[in-house]
Amino acid sequence: MRLNKYFLFFLLLLCFSNIKLLAQETVYSELGAGEIKKDWLIESHHYTAQIIIKDNQIILDNGLLRRSFLIRPNLACIDYTNLTNGQQLLRSIEPEANIVINKTNYAIGGLHGQKEKAYLNLNWEQSLHAMDADFYFTNYTISTIDSFVKYNPQTWMPANYGPSVQKFKGKQLVLHFASKLPALKGFIVNVHYNIYDGLPLLCKWVTIQNGADAVVVDRVVNEVLGLVEEESAVVGKPEEMKKQHGIYIETNYAFNNSMRYDISDHTTHWEMDSTYTSQVNYNYQTPCLLKVYPDKAPGIELAPNEKFTSVRTFELLMDSYDRTRRGLMIKKMYRTIAPWVTQNPIFMHLVSKNDAEVKAAIDQCVATGFEAVILSFGSHLNMEDSSTQNINRWKALADYAHQKNILLGGYSLFSSRTISPQDDVIDAKTGKPGGAFFGNAPCFGSNWGLGYRDKIVDFFKQTKFDIWENDGPYPGDVCASTTHPGHKGLDDSQWKQMNIQKGLYQTLNSMGVYINAPDWYFLDGTHKIAVGYREVNFSLSREQQIILNRQNIIDGTKEKTPSMGWGFVPLTKYQGGGPEAVLEPLQDHIKDYQQLMVQYFGAGVQACYRGPRLYDTEITRNMVRSTIDWYKKYRTILNADIIPLRRADGRDWDGWMHVDPSGTDKAFIMFFNPTLAPMTKTLTIPLYYTGMKGTATFMDDLGATKKYTLGVDHNIQITVTIPASGYKWMVIN
């Protein structure tokens, strides 16, 4: 009898184990599929984009998402499915886009007659009809996709992301629409879709080809989706309710200095749908209608035959609520659509007073393995001086740097300063300068602003500088001036200034210039933004900075690749603070100097080492050189995406892990001990996103190796000893 009890217990245990294993292994399987899907974050090459024309439908499908359109009686989206988990996102038919022309709203495509908006039954197709006032579908074209930015990297980047090997793989579908209305004769609207290989991602945007008459475009809504609600509430306002988690939206129209996209976004609108009369919310306030358009971009005048291009909307379908997985998905998106963000040169921030100091810094970079010098704010560089003497001076220094294989860059401020009453942003309320994001700021559409753009481009063309540190990028200021040549008035001022700023970044990137800019212009050509820190914290003690920097790294890489953010190391006094805050004299604080370097390089995050020099003695030089050599040895894996293991709290261990399932080194772990005593810990390490199966070999910083067998949950347990106030690293393959 006892034997039977044990046998029954064993069967139950086996059963539960199989259930757990099944749940883990089928989490990404397509509903109804006969095989387990490969996780695209680990093996993306299985999924190829295709555009299918079948009966009365056009279908975008890459094995990870499917978006389907009825063609007749007018084109309309009837299906938007995440194939990794079977989630149907669509509940209602909406227009493909909406445009407001000469104060009149027009629907682009779409069908009418859906009486129930909680769900869409395909058997209702025969009851749907088109409206004569709507733009009607005429035809389509299919092509391959290409980069939106003609990038030309001159700095280090992972081998598989350069333009010679990074082909933008996928398909483009363009849907063409026209109007039956005589007033819009010759006015063509094109709806563009990119579907990418290897990830559940679409890009959508609208182009307009004007006809023979001038028109005013007051709004272009380039995406409209009647989405299934994330949650219901009998009473509740839109801002109180969760939005659909199955789709992540990002556009190339974001700004506000927050160093995060979600806070910088100015285009995503979750609206109510009063035609959805069966919703649970009594006041019809469920946020279930997604629209994408800029808030402040009316009054765009189009001349006859002029072309207009809307913002680009990237739509990434999410299969999980897990923050780490969602972050990895977003980072994979950036690597795919903006591969220039993977460039990651090693630079110092030089504070210089004369040319001799620039040459000395270049020589120190050669001696230590640094790759670039950026003349920081407060240096003697002025890019706005277009005199022959100034250009020749800086070209000679750039030539000196290039002879030694060092890149040279510099700092220039656009916003957060005043130029003149004629060139500053004009406040619509007062009619005077002011009211800008930073209080006072120049208008990019003013004579000075347009001249600034041209001077920057000319400076880089003539001097052959390699890096631009553009502080105060255009932050979205509207301007009420009616005399600035770059915009007509208040209405079109934001749209026109944004295009000037984006055009400048695109031009410089195509010239091979690397761009640091503290605002969210990644999708139009910038490379790096601040990782996310409080500047005055660099006047705190080195001990505090060490912990705070590790917190910043964890927080700033949740949705950014390591290469997308810069950190900061004040070699000399910055923002106040005393001797306890700075590293000079460097040899006297060599332990803290090395700790800060290892933290940043161990995260793949380049810091701005701001000061007049990188070393002051041979001992310091050797430390810097050895740290750089270590980083370069593991550079590829250290630039892979980060999974946080434990956020720094100053009382226990903390650390992170890089993962690269396609690399030779599959993972790299950094452990830190903030306490004054050595620490031995037995830790669970999650290896699922390394793509490894069976066994994994760990090698630590002392060269010791050990092989581990992965559990069914893809985790292993290791015991690690971390030195007091120190660190330990491990590479896994």
Predicted regions located by residue number:
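Active-site-adjacent "subsite" loops/lids of carbohydrate-active enzymes
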Residues: W394-D399, Q403, L407-F465, Y474, ...
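Active-site-proximal substrate-binding groove within the catalytic cores of carbohydrate-active enzymes
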Residues: I58, N62-G63, I500-T705, T719-A724
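Polysaccharide-binding surfaces and accessory modules of carbohydrate-active proteins
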Residues: E25-L60, L65, C77-T286, P294-P298, ...
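Glycine-rich, aromatic-flanked loop segments that form ligand/cofactor-binding clefts
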Residues: L122-W156, E315-M329, R393-F437, V513-D524
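C-terminal beta-strand-rich structural cap/linker in extracellular carbohydrate-active enzymes
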Residues: T709-N733
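Aromatic- and glycine-enriched glycan-recognition loops and surfaces
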Residues: M348-K429, L450-D454, Q494-G503
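Short Pro-Gly-centered flexible turn/kink motifs
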Residues: I58, F137, S164, I300-M318, ...
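Extended acidic/polar, glycine-enriched regions
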Residues: A212-V215, Y276-M333
